[in-house]
Amino acid sequence: MKLRRFLLPVAICLVLAMTYGSVTAGQVKWEPYGPQVDQIIMPIIKDAEAQLIAFNRGDIDVYPGLTRPADINVVKANPNAELTMNYGFHMFYLCYNMRREPLDADILRQAIAHVIDRDNIIQTLFEGYMLPLAAFLPPSSGFYKEDIPRFPYNPEEAKKLLDAAGYTVDPATGIRIDPKTGKPLRKMTIFTPTYEVAPTSAELGKIIAEACQAINLPIEPEPMDFPVMLDKLDMAEFDMYMLAWSLSRIPTSLYNFFHSSNDVEAGYNRPGIRDAELDKLLEGLYYAPSEEAARKAADEAQVILARRQPYTVLYSRPYMDAFRKDRFTGYVPMHGYGAANYTNKWTTLNIKPVKGKGGTVRWLLMEEPKVLNPCTASSAYEWEVLGRLYDDLMEINPETMEDIPWMAKSWEVGTWEPEPGKTGTVITWHLEKGIKWQDTTPFTSRDIKFTLEYLRDNNVPRYISNVQEIVKVETPDDYTAKVYFETESYWHLYRAGGNFLPEWIWKDVKDYKTFEPWLEAHPEVPGLTKVVGHGPFILDQYKVGEYVRLKKNPIYWRLSK
């Protein structure tokens, strides 16, 4: 499938392309085989200044996700560095906890949206490198919607909204009064990562808190340790927070983030929005029988989201990744994901030393992975590790953005009757032969069946929207899996795969939340942990606070020919 892409304004495209001299996947030779290096060492460097120093002196070879203009300019000036730029499926946002008063009031969230000066933020913090965004899908998405309700920067309008709704200023405290209680509003906080880990995010929290204080809202920034922050978000113990999503081509992220069924502990509906009209539209998107029906539902859902503001979206950033071109080549820029993101299989497979073969590439990890459990991992830092250990049934061609066969050599999409008069989707996967788990166990259709049923039966929040409609999985033979959904949807093809779990490891795991497979030795194979994948790299060592080391999978089914 190839989704229609929204064309960014030509002027912006030209300016950014000229600024970075970026290359595209079509200009880079890439192969569907690898990996070309013997190991990846991922030094954990949280401090932004230390990251830049390490890259410039050659201590790291891959510096992903640059955001600070000063860092970008320093890298551009380094004759041994190459900076790639790709428009991203990226969205930076302020999230409100709509379960808590007073942030359950639409007016309050709309007023806060009015005091956020996107243009000034982008100019002062990013020197114009980011793209202002108010919509709930980025411009690189084929489902981006431009014409939505907006709350442009206008502090005076924010004051008028609050005054008209009864949030008048208490003369004694200078704080606005909650019309429900007649008392000054309680103090509210904006969680962000720390300045050391994400300086621009922390600074944005401060800027927005100060803008809110200027209209008499008692809001303060609260930078904190990132793993602690994630724990609080999972438990809905927050007022507001600022983070970014790295999305995909598929617009059902709207369902995952905003449908009421996903308002559960550790679920993706972190704002806790519950809106019957919105739910109906999101279900129309999720179960759309065609791209046309999906687009209509997505458009209408985005209008409601823009009006209600469970998030206030600030900007979308191009992915800017730096590589030491004096030492490595073979990195593949990819629309929507960049050249260094874990979703980009092609750089992982194709990166190689300029001289010689094999060797070690040092790939920066900007934050400590909290967990290396595929059922509970949620941050990009965790998946930067895990994403290189697993393969999927399909991959994305980096030039055309079309689906291409991977572990599945082919597939069919059909229908069946879950009950008389009702139509459901059935996906039939035909697997490649010879694929093995990293402990040499053959990968078969039974692994697909076990994984999908385990995720469904255990209601794993990270995957619940993918598996909740699965009725059964059949395995006619070792290389054929048939996944039956109780409903019909254009998108079920993308829910019938995923990060598969080895049954002999996971069948006895009763509590996936507390399972720490990276800390437990494999029961039979020395040197392996219970994090067992089938991808190009094996988890070799994780030394907390120092590094993660991945080694080349010697039995990878796509080894270079």
Which residue ranges define each predicted feature?
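Extracytoplasmic/peripheral linker and loop segments enriched in polar/acidic and small residues
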Residues: I122, A214, P218-M229, N256-R324, ...
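Ligand/substrate-recognition segments at binding pockets and active sites
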Residues: T168-L247, E291, G356-G359, W363-V371, ...
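Acidic-aromatic pocket-rim loops
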Residues: E82, H90, V228-Y287, P333, ...
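Long beta-strand-rich cores associated with HINT superfamily self-processing modules
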Residues: F323-T360
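Surface-exposed binding/hinge segments that line
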Residues: R4-L7, H114, D326, I464-P517, ...
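Append "and occasionally in soluble cytosolic enzymes with long acidic Gly/Pro-rich linkers
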Residues: G26-W30, D104-E210, R274, A293, ...
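Aromatic-rich, solvent-exposed beta-strand/loop patch
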Residues: G21-A50, D71-H90, T168-T173, I177-K187, ...
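N-terminal lobe/hinge region of extracytoplasmic solute-binding protein
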Residues: L364-P420, V532
